[in-house]
Amino acid sequence: MRKIMLVIMGLGCISLANAGQAPQPCGPAGQLADEFSANVGSDARCFELRMYTAEAAVNGEGGINDLHQRFREEEVAIFEKHGAEVVAVWQRLDDPNTLVWMLAYRDRAHRQEVWAGFAADPAWAALREKYPVGVSIEAYMMSSTNYSNLK
């Protein structure tokens, strides 16, 4: 029963982090409103910084170690299969239950394509079932500045 609840909670967190909100702008300056584009590069990609704070493990299941294993084992590969670039994955040192990662996309439309493919991928469903980790999610959409080394 606990495993089923964690899977349901994990699905809910993904849905909450990706739905019900107006899409935040990101990508090249030419695709952004004037209020966002003044300092954004014409060749900027869309970056997404995501922070997942894992619930504590219960009876050895779930928790930050299972979340890292899920990423290590296949989650990164599934995103890359659907066209995202996983720029980096970090362990927060001031909050050891939080994994931070950054993805890059060509633009907002590409992000939508990547997430649709990821969500529909049977490998993701199997991985989520294998490592049912309840997480709270913070996500930020960004475009690189016109003077950034990272484009």
Q: Where in the sequence are the language-model features?
A:
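Acidic, polar ligand-binding/catalytic clefts
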Residues: 125-126
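Positively charged n-region of N-terminal signal peptides that target proteins for export
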Residues: 1-4
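Short S/T/G/P-rich N-terminal loop/turn motif that feeds into the first structured element of a domain
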Residues: 16-100, 104-122, 132-151
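Bacterial N-terminal signal peptides
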Residues: 6-15
